[in-house]
Amino acid sequence: MNKFLIIDGLNLVRRIYAAIPDETDMQSLTERVSSACTKLLRVHRPTHVAIVWDGDEISWRKQLYPNYKKGRKPMPEPLAQGLVALQDHLTAMHIGSIYAAAEADDVIATLAIKTAKAQGEAIIVSTDKGFSQLNHRQISQWDHFNQQYLDIAALEQKLGVERSQFLDLMALAGDSGNKIPGIAGIGPKSAAELLKTFRSLPTLFSSLSNLGAKQAKKLAEGKEMARLSYKLAQLQTDLPLNINLKDFRVIDSPPEKTINQD
């Protein structure tokens, strides 16, 4: 069975970079990233590995909602200047790169879903909880910095909703980290309570007459914003990748069933 290790490039690199005392020390960054990737390969023993990078284009989410991710700090200049050399070094280690046009998240999600649908296993290396919406038994998420898989049960308990409701929760309450707005006046706790009662957004919005006047008014006025927020939070899983899987095979890994990535 194919086991694809899919690394969220800047999620890994920027966290390692932040821990380096001298921000111009690209040699130290390269050594630490190389060590991290070597450890990932040793721990998970995948048949395939790729590291996915964000691109420079304006994402469709930003075009849809200009405030999306507004206020994010730009990449530090030394890192921006040294990134190509780091990517080349990883290529020399036989860790191939995939370059997204804009956000890496949709490419990672698409690759994971395609792998799972082809009866393979996908392991996403990232601390981004947004990948938790990929509800498939053949997809898991690994936090390299805490050396553990994402605990979905613990996340469900923390958020107060089931995994299948994660997107509905973000549609109602928003996501401050990504500047996804949600509905004004609806916080995470009240959103979770609403979803416990009504289970889904369609049922909730068709049942506003069962709520108090004040809350019903907030929801009615914010319905379109909830739809927008849902769309912003939802990962695309059907992008054309135009890659050849054999280019990402781990050296010395035995041949396995081919995944159609077209």
UniProtKB/Swiss-Prot annotation:
Q: Name one GO molecular function term.
A: magnesium ion binding
The EC category is hydrolase
UniProt key word Membrane: no
Q: Which InterPro entries match?
A: 5-3_exonucl_a-hlix_arch_N, 5-3_exonuclease, 5-3_exonuclease_C_sf, DNA_polI_H3TH, FEN, HhH2, PIN-like_dom_sf, Xni
Q: Which residues bind K(+)?
A: L172, A173, P181, I183, I186
Q: Which domain of life is it from?
A: Bacteria
Could you mention a single GO BP entry for this protein?
DNA replication, Okazaki fragment processing
Q: Where is the 5'-3' exonuclease domain?
A: 162-257
Q: Which cofactor does it need?
A: Mg(2+); K(+)
UniProt keyword annotations, A-Z: DNA-binding, Endonuclease, Hydrolase, Magnesium, Metal-binding, Nuclease, Potassium
Q: Which residues bind Mg(2+)?
A: D105
Query: DNA-binding: present as a keyword of the record?
Result: yes
CC cofactor note: Binds 2 Mg(2+) per subunit. Only one magnesium ion has a direct interaction with the protein, the other interactions are indirect. Binds 1 K(+) per subunit. The potassium ion strongly increases the affinity for DNA.
Q: Where is this region: Interaction with DNA?
A: 185-190
Reported EC number(s) for this entry are 3.1.-.-
Its annotated function is as follows: Has flap endonuclease activity. During DNA replication, flap endonucleases cleave the 5'-overhanging flap structure that is generated by displacement synthesis when DNA polymerase encounters the 5'-end of a downstream Okazaki fragment.
Which PANTHER family does this UniProt record tie to the protein?
A: 5'-3' EXONUCLEASE FAMILY PROTEIN, FLAP ENDONUCLEASE XNI
UniProt lists the family membership as follows: Belongs to the Xni family.
What's the protein name?
Answer: Flap endonuclease Xni
Q: Which gene encodes it?
A: xni
